[in-house]
């Protein structure tokens, strides 16, 4: 089995999907989890205005709507959390995503004060954060806020991780990667677009250039620039297609060096790192 085949198998990626079937699969997955653990009353998700959180948010709200109707349990809710760092450049996209999702509840937590306070505390301890590490601080502060909200609403935190993100480890460890449940896991980027198209999402929310937008020195840096490959390249690779040798090397290098991000903390029983 080639490394490409191993990666595809590990991430559960498929070369083709039926959008309606995958929508149903994600909704039923969320509903089943909530029904298995009836003490869970809320799904909590950060909404950025980008493709992934818009899709995950829509699926969460659809799952909650169906479950309330089927069970009569009105205590169930989907909580969308806006977490800007100061003023977000694409705030209108966030509002458009909220309008599309129609969440039961919307909370706004501006993380800038908390991030700056943490940075100052570290500075006083003799640690000066780089811009890149400050970006990770933002991602972790957002996750901290979501877990606090989930803790106060008997909820779980929903993630937006998918195959095209998992393969490159393009997420912050214990930041946006530290979630309870990931309904998009298995899909690549273009397949996510297919689901949003089927759901009637406004095109500008999934046709814009994806960005983590974590770095102050490089605001709105496109993911594809940071990664050195395009999402079309990544999706082709995940679909088992032949890609240029340099593209394959870049993708596989990202996959191998970020393996620790896709695993629990390493223990004496692990040996995947002995390479």
UniProtKB/Swiss-Prot annotation:
Positions bound to Mg(2+): 52, 165
Pfam family, one: NAD_synthase
Keyword Lipid biosynthesis: no
EC numbers on record: 6.3.1.5
Pathway: Cofactor biosynthesis; NAD(+) biosynthesis; NAD(+) from deamido-NAD(+) (ammonia route): step 1/1
Enzyme class: ligase
Listed GO MF terms: ATP binding; glutaminase activity; metal ion binding; NAD+ synthase (glutamine-hydrolyzing) activity; NAD+ synthase activity
InterPro entries registered for this protein in UniProt: NAD/GMP_synthase, NAD_synthase, NH(3)-dep_NAD(+)_synth, Rossmann-like_a/b/a_fold
Gene Ontology cellular component annotations, sorted alphabetically: cytoplasm
Residues that, per the record, bind deamido-NAD(+): 140, 173, 180, 260-261
Catalyzed chemical reaction(s): deamido-NAD(+) + NH4(+) + ATP = AMP + diphosphate + NAD(+) + H(+)
A Gene Ontology biological process term: NAD biosynthetic process
Residues engaged in binding ATP: 46-53, 160, 189, 211
Regions annotated as coiled coil: none
Keywords per UniProt: ATP-binding, Ligase, Magnesium, Metal-binding, NAD, Nucleotide-binding
Subunit structure: Homodimer.
Recorded family membership: Belongs to the NAD synthetase family.
Function: Catalyzes the ATP-dependent amidation of deamido-NAD to form NAD. Uses ammonia as a nitrogen source.
PANTHER family membership: NH 3 /GLUTAMINE-DEPENDENT NAD + SYNTHETASE (PTHR23090), NH(3)-DEPENDENT NAD(+) SYNTHETASE (PTHR23090:SF7)
Protein name, UniProt field: NH(3)-dependent NAD(+) synthetase
Organism for this UniProt entry: Escherichia coli O8 (strain IAI1)
Lineage summary: Bacteria, Pseudomonadati, Pseudomonadota, Gammaproteobacteria, Enterobacterales
């Amino acid at each position: 089995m080639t490394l490409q085949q191993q990666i595809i198998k590990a991430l559960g990626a498929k070369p083709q999907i039926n959008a309606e079937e995958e929508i149903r699969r994600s909704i039923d997955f969320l509903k089943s989890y909530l029904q298995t653990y009836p003490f869970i009353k809320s799904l909590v998700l950060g909404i950025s205005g980008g493709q992934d959180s818009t899709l995950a948010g829509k699926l969460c709200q659809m799952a909650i709507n169906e479950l309330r109707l089927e069970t009569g349990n009105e205590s169930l809710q989907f909580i969308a959390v806006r977490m800007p760092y100061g003023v977000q450049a694409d705030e209108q996209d966030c509002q458009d995503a909220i309008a599309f999702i129609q969440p039961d509840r919307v909370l706004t937590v501006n993380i800038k004060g908390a991030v700056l306070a943490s940075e100052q505390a570290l500075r006083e301890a003799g640690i000066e954060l780089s811009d890149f590490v400050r970006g990770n601080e933002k991602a972790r502060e957002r996750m901290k806020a979501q877990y606090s909200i989930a803790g106060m609403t008997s909820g779980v935190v929903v993630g937006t991780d998918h195959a095209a993100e998992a393969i490159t480890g393009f997420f912050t460890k214990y930041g946006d990667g530290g979630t309870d449940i990931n309904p998009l896991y298995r899909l690549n980027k273009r397949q996510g677009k297919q689901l949003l198209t089927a759901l009637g999402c406004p095109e500008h929310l999934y046709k814009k250039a994806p960005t983590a937008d974590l770095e102050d020195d490089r605001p709105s840096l496109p993911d594809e620039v940071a990664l050195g490959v395009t999402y079309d390249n990544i999706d082709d690779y995940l679909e088992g297609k032949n890609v240029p040798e340099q593209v394959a090397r870049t993708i596989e290098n990202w996959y191998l060096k970020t393996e620790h991000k896709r695993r629990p903390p390493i223990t004496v029983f692990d040996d995947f790192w002995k390479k």
